[in-house]
């Protein structure tokens, strides 16, 4: 059937607000160009009128200038109307885009709430409390193990009063040791020989002095 009657053309999508705004702005720009050309004509006619004398010729130029000015006013009105249309469409487009953004935000929030509910279903408060209890028990067991490993064997019990008394006495002994240390140094010094050294003989029976040299008999 399509060979005889042809295939229906697909319908073009309706223009969006953005397309309409672009079309209206383009028309407004075209009108601005026309107004600029009319301004140039008005300047030319105004110069001619200044140079001309009163009479039919001057009146004719004035009529032309008035027609141009009337056209300018009409174009300006059309331009203002198009500018208002463009502004209204931009406001509507902004409102629509804001609503779309709001819907996207709401959808994202709904999805987030759904995911949160799903996550909460997988987390049980009882399980968390059981885990906390297990961790606490394990920490207590670990502390008991450390105490058992650090236990000392055969250590006699000491009286705190005796230890404090020994500590005080130990401080006095240390001070006494520091005060008498110079006496120990003096006692350890070599003794000074007393009197004159005695005469000694070598293996040959000859008298020698303290250096082992033969003594010279006194004359």
UniProtKB/Swiss-Prot annotation:
Pfam families: Snf7. The modification Phosphoserine is found at residue 86. Belongs to the SNF7 family. GO terms for biological process: autophagosome maturation; autophagy; cellular response to lipopolysaccharide; cellular response to muramyl dipeptide; endosome to lysosome transport; erythrocyte differentiation; late endosome to lysosome transport; lysosome organization. Residues 1-10 have a biased composition (Basic residues). Residues 26-179 form a coiled coil. Keywords: Coiled coil, Cytoplasm, Endosome, Membrane, Phosphoprotein, Protein transport, Transport, Ubl conjugation. The keyword Transport applies. The keyword Cell inner membrane does not apply. This is Charged multivesicular body protein 5. Probable peripherally associated component of the endosomal sorting required for transport complex III (ESCRT-III) which is involved in multivesicular bodies (MVBs) formation and sorting of endosomal cargo proteins into MVBs. MVBs contain intraluminal vesicles (ILVs) that are generated by invagination and scission from the limiting membrane of the endosome and mostly are delivered to lysosomes enabling degradation of membrane proteins, such as stimulated growth factor receptors, lysosomal enzymes and lipids. It comes from Mus musculus (Mouse). InterPro entries: Snf7_fam. Residues 1-21, 188-219 are annotated as: Disordered. It is found in: Cytoplasm, Cytosol; Endosome membrane; Midbody. ISGylated. Isgylation inhibits its interaction with VTA1.
